[in-house]
């Protein structure tokens, strides 16, 4: 399966039990900041934004004072899982980022999608990739 198929079929799909509800944008990005696959709506990010995200995975709490920035959008960092998941909130939407051995899985959402639904979609794929050694 191509990386694009993972984004299209496992991240940008309808959320279980909520037909028509789906993430706003999603991507799989290597630890080095190279995009493996992304939805057409995923924001163009700056290298320093990706560096900040990677630093927060290695040093949990790094982004808390400044917020998480992606594509020029600032998210308030909320509870995640140190070294494994970063979650952010902005207005009625937010972001979930799951770290795997080689990549970061991104999901961005807006209402009516709930934070927990985004977490479920992103973390399920991230856990699967971890199980595959990726």
Swiss-Prot record:
Pfam families (alphabetical): Profilin (PF00235)
Protein name: Profilin-3
Function: Binds to actin and affects the structure of the cytoskeleton. At high concentrations, profilin prevents the polymerization of actin, whereas it enhances it at low concentrations.
Family from the record: Belongs to the profilin family.
GO terms for MF: actin monomer binding
Subunit structure and binding partners: Occurs in many kinds of cells as a complex with monomeric actin in a 1:1 ratio.
SS bonds (residue pairs): 13-118
Modification(s) after translation: Phosphorylated by MAP kinases.
Compartments in which it is found: Cytoplasm, Cytoskeleton
Species assigned in the record: Olea europaea (Common olive)
Motif Involved in PIP2 interaction location, chain numbering: 84-100
This protein's record includes keyword Disulfide bond: yes
Origin: domain of life: Eukaryota
Miscellaneous field: The variability of the residues taking part of IgE-binding epitopes might be responsible of the difference in cross-reactivity among olive pollen cultivars, and between distantly related pollen species, leading to a variable range of allergy reactions among atopic patients.
UniProt GO cellular component terms: cell cortex; cytoskeleton
Keywords: Actin-binding, Allergen, Cytoplasm, Cytoskeleton, Disulfide bond, Phosphoprotein
């Amino acid at each position: 399966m191509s990386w694009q198929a993972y984004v299209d079929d496992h991240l940008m799909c309808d959320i279980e039990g909520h037909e028509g509800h789906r993430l706003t944008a999603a991507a799989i990005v290597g630890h080095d900041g190279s995009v493996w696959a992304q939805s057409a709506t995923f924001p163009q990010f700056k290298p320093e934004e990706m560096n900040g995200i990677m630093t927060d995975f290695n040093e949990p709490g790094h982004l808390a004072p400044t917020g998480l920035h992606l594509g020029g959008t600032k998210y308030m960092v909320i509870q995640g899982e140190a070294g494994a998941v970063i979650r952010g909130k902005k207005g009625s939407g937010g972001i979930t980022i799951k770290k795997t051995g080689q990549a970061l899985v991104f999901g961005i959402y807006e209402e009516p999608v709930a934070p927990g639904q985004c977490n479920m979609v992103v973390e399920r794929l991230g856990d699967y990739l971890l199980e595959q050694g990726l």
